[in-house]
UniProtKB/Swiss-Prot annotation:
SUPFAM superfamilies: SAICAR synthase-like (SSF56104), vWA-like (SSF53300). The lineage of its organism: Eukaryota, Metazoa, Chordata, Craniata, Vertebrata. Residues 412-424, 722-731 have a biased composition (Low complexity). The gene is PIPSL. This is Putative PIP5K1A and PSMD4-like protein. Residues 28-396 form the PIPK domain.
Length: 862
């Protein structure tokens, strides 16, 4: 709701977010801009009188305040605005940041205060205002109280990170201030400017790596330069953006390091802001008075801050060399699209000032992740970081493949056409496993017509095969081997991390192609049955167990990306270790399946493979093998291995042979490894919907609802056993017999059903809106539904569960409806405008206020 505050004229005006509007609807931010410049002028001047010294911890908590009356004072000049107070947070610490980025205090002062700040028309959804300095060097943004508070807590760690590595895509903060006027606190932060106004931006994206509700709204599209989102990017640029290999490696390395920093602070839901300048389009555009400044008409002013451009923010060595034909990158990262057009990319990570614990309170309850809250708090930011990096480095940014020589093109084209056949169309054939003369083999064939990519000479349809790559370029290749069960699966993935894993015949390398395929397999298996578990084992000489069996695919993927090529593949030993890992955890209704990715020559002879297959057959173990990259060497051996496993039935185990191509994961989709023997894709909505939730639409919700109900069932059974044992002890009856305990459990269960269990919500009978309301109530009321106490959790180790923190967090969330609204907008499946949710938020806010008043009264009585 809009509130009314007095302003300079004495007339009440409306206040929406940080933006003040008068009765005519016009924005009146000139007073705010003037107050900011007056305050910064005084702060920089007073800071120059302080001696330079090492930064101490107390410097991060220092707050300086100065009052600016309208008539002026001994320390402040007179002005025509309302009287205001200006606060400066951690001035000494921020002075160190200036020095780190090569900014002199007089340059900082001149940029921000020599000329009026320029207001940008694109304000945030929360009502935040954006100003840019006249020289395009700095951005001034208004932030919420929670964001400013979080930045204060972030500063010590931020200081350490920048001290170790000033080249980062994270926001570079140069100052945090607060203007107190008219009974309101307006907090502002000064940052580096990612998008210079001197370069015309043709399109802009805000990317998270998610597809849920990630499309620009119609209102956003009507803006002069709209900010598009992930689905728009996948539609507009499906092939991604192509960078030189050195630039791509430097960018991905910087993203990985920055995401690790954000993960350590438990920050998630950040985005990559990317604005694209098309050099070829700019040269063809006619110049006019209405056109924005083009590249040729106005050059950027000299930079005052180091490492402030996108190109400087990644590795410095990537600035030299490469194949891009631009004379002046103007701070942008050179790239190409699939048409071969030259681009300049201006990128940076944004929206990092949101504490993860508030989102966790709502989102985790909505997802019904009840137990092991501390583990979830640590792993979910890690999973988000892993997902974010994967999307950026594999989908958004890609390497420009090397050009083979004409003679090598001829050789690769002839060998490729022999694989593809004469039709010229893509085809996938599957031959079922049978004993005898039939071989168990799946082959993916594809042929690319010549001339398809004539518009993009630097983007090739196929990377040259291994034998045609120069000797100086290492080419390792990945392989994995997972374990799966048919009804309830416990999957151990055996990863081939031998020396062949860097080969580039699978894009971008065998190792990364394997990682994407393992990701697809693990998600398919866990979605087909939420009780399935997955493990990860390497197939190198050591056969290292990276993760034990777990349903957390985020943990699997996190470990997966730490694998580096080394040594040789030990196929037999790896399969044996995977079998032992599964056998140790096998349940009565579990079937064991191993899925092995093999991307290196198998040195084990056929005799040993057949012997191993016979042993596995006795143990009723099925093995699926994805053979890629070395099909000519491995196919005969692995076919004999799989045929021995299948025996006379000819079913159960599978061998998939995939020749080099653009996507290993896509080649597996239609095969029985994912689709099952019946051909229905596992984990993609083929089964009936439990709890009224489509697993393909929201797999996480389907999983956690099932886990939640299973945990409740187990808890009730355990309580029934304890109660039965206590009753038997009182009656003097021995409790050693299993039949007696089972009877007691049955009676207790029947008794509970008769009298009902009032502490737990009945999710099966709730509508979607009621489930959302219930989740919000659970998140803010703690243990009311019997969810806070668990014998498996050490209460002292759980995060944010202490009572004082709970009261403070709940109070802050409920007293900041704008923040709560922004959190709800980012939750999957939640419509914040739904009447049921709005009523729930209102009732929770009023309840939180009543509880706080009640607690204060009790404290006063004491």
């Amino acid at each position: 709701m809009a509130s009314e505050v007095p302003y300079a004229s004495g007339m009440p005006i409306k206040k929406i977010g940080h933006r003040s509007v008068d009765s005519s609807g016009g924005t009146t931010s000139s007073a705010l801009k003037g107050a900011i410049q007056l305050g910064i002028t005084h702060t920089v001047g007073s800071l120059s009188t302080k001696p330079e010294s090492d930064v101490l911890m107390q410097d991060f908590h220092m707050v300086e305040s100065i009052f600016f009356p309208s008539e002026g004072s001994n320390l402040t000049p007179a002005h025509h605005y309302n009287a205001f107070r200006f606060k400066t947070y951690a001035p000494v610490a921020f002075r160190y940041f200036w020095e780190l980025f090569g900014i002199r205090p007089d340059d900082y002062l001149y940029s921000l205060c020599s000329e009026p700040l320029i207001e940008l028309c694109s304000s945030g959804a929360s009502g935040s205002l954006f100003y840019v300095s006249s020289d395009d060097e700095f951005i001034v943004k208004t932030v919420r109280h929670k964001e400013a508070e979080f930045l204060q807590k972030l500063l010590p760690g931020y200081y350490i990170n920048l001290n170790q590595n000033p080249r980062t895509l994270l926001p570079k903060f140069y100052g945090l201030y607060c203007v107190q006027t008219g009974g309101k606190n307006i907090r502002i932060v000064v940052m580096n400017n990612l998008l210079p106004r001197s370069v015309k931006m043709h399109i802009k994206y805000d990317l998270k790596g998610s597809t849920y509700r990630r499309r620009a709204s119609q209102k956003e599209r009507e803006k002069p330069l709209p900010t598009f989102k992930d689905l728009d990017f996948l539609q507009d640029i499906p092939d991604g953006l192509f960078l030189d290999a050195d630039v791509h490696n430097a960018l991905c390395k910087t993203l990985q390091r920055d995401c690790l920093v954000l993960q350590s602070f438990k920050i998630m839901d950040y985005s990559l802001l990317m604005s694209i300048h098309n050099i070829d389009h700019a040269q063809r555009e006619p110049l006019s008075s209405e056109t924005q400044y083009s590249v040729d008409t106005r050059r950027p002013a000299p930079q005052k801050a180091l490492y402030s451009t996108a190109m400087e923010s990644i590795q410095g060595e990537a600035r030299r060399g490469g194949t891009m034909e631009t004379d002046d990158h103007m701070g942008g990262i050179p790239a190409r699209n699939s048409k071969g057009e030259r681009l300049l990319l201006y990128i940076g990570i944004i929206d990092i000032l949101q504490s993860y614990r508030f989102v966790k309170k709502l989102e985790h309850s909505w997802k019904a992740l009840i137990h092991d809250g501390d583990t979830v708090s640590v792993h979910r930011p890690g999973f988000y970081a892993e997902w974010f990096q994967r999307f950026m480095c594999n989908t958004v940014f890609k390497k420009i493949p090397l050009k083979p020589s004409p003679s090598k093109k001829l050789r690769s084209g002839s060998s490729f056409s022999q694989r593809a056949g004469s039709s010229g169309n893509s085809c996938i054939t599957y031959q079922p496993l049978v004993s005898g003369e039939h071989k168990a083999q799946v082959t993916t064939k594809a042929e690319v017509e010549p001339g398809v990519h004539l518009g993009c000479p630097d983007v090739l349809p196929q990377t040259p095969p291994l034998e045609e790559i120069s000797e100086g370029s290492p080419t390792p290749d990945p392989s994995f081997s997972p374990l799966v069960e048919e009804t309830l699966q416990m999957l151990t993935t055996s990863v081939d991390n031998s020396e062949y894993m860097g080969n580039g015949d699978f894009l971008p390398t065998r190792l990364q192609a394997q990682q994407d395929a393992v990701n697809t397999v693990c998600h398919s298996k866990t979605r087909s049955n939420p009780e399935n578990n997955v493990g990860l084992i390497t197939l190198d000489n050591d056969c290292e167990v990276l993760t034990t069996l777990t349903p957390d695919t985020g943990r699997i993927l996190s470990k997966l990306h730490t694998v580096q090529p080394k040594g040789k593949i030990t196929f037999c030993m790896g399969i044996h270790v995977a079998h032992l890992a599964l056998k140790h955890r096998q349940g009565n209704n579990h079937k064991i399946r191993i899925i092995a990715f093999v991307g290196n020559p198998v040195e084990d002879n056929e005799k040993n493979l057949v012997k191993l297959a016979k042993c596995l057959k006795k143990e009723k173990v099925n093995v699926d093998i994805i053979n890629f990259g070395e099909e000519e060497v491995n196919t005969e051996k692995l076919t004999a291995f799989v045929n021995t496993l299948n025996g006379k039935d000819g079913t159960g185990s599978h061998l998939v042979t995939v020749p080099p191509g653009p996507s290993l994961a896509d080649a597996l989709i239609s095969f029985p490894i994912l689709a099952g023997e019946g051909g229905a894709m596992m984990g993609l909505g083929a089964s009936d919907f439990e709890f009224g939730v489509d697993p393909s639409a929201d797999p996480e919700l389907a999983l956690v609802l099932r886990v939640f109900m299973e945990e409740q069932r187990q808890r009730q059974e355990e309580e029934a056993r304890q109660a039965a044992a206590a009753s038997a002890a009182e009656a003097g009856i021995a409790t050693t017999g299993t039949e007696d305990s089972d009877d007691a459990l049955l009676k207790m269960t029947i008794s509970q059903q008769e009298f009902g269990h009032t502490g737990l919500p009945d999710l099966s009978s709730m509508t979607e809106e009621e489930k959302i309301v219930c989740a919000m109530q659970m998140s803010l009321q703690g243990a009311e539904f019997g969810l806070a106490e668990s014998a498996d959790i050490d209460a002292s180790s759980a995060m944010d569960t202490s009572e004082p923190a709970k009261e403070e967090d709940d109070y802050d969330v409920m007293q900041d409806p704008e923040f709560l609204q922004s959190v709800l907008e980012n939750l999957p499946g939640v419509d914040p405008n739904n009447e049921a949710i709005r009523n729930a938020v209102g009732s929770l806010a009023s309840q939180a206020t009543k509880d706080s008043k009640k607690d204060k009264k009790e404290e006063d009585k004491k």
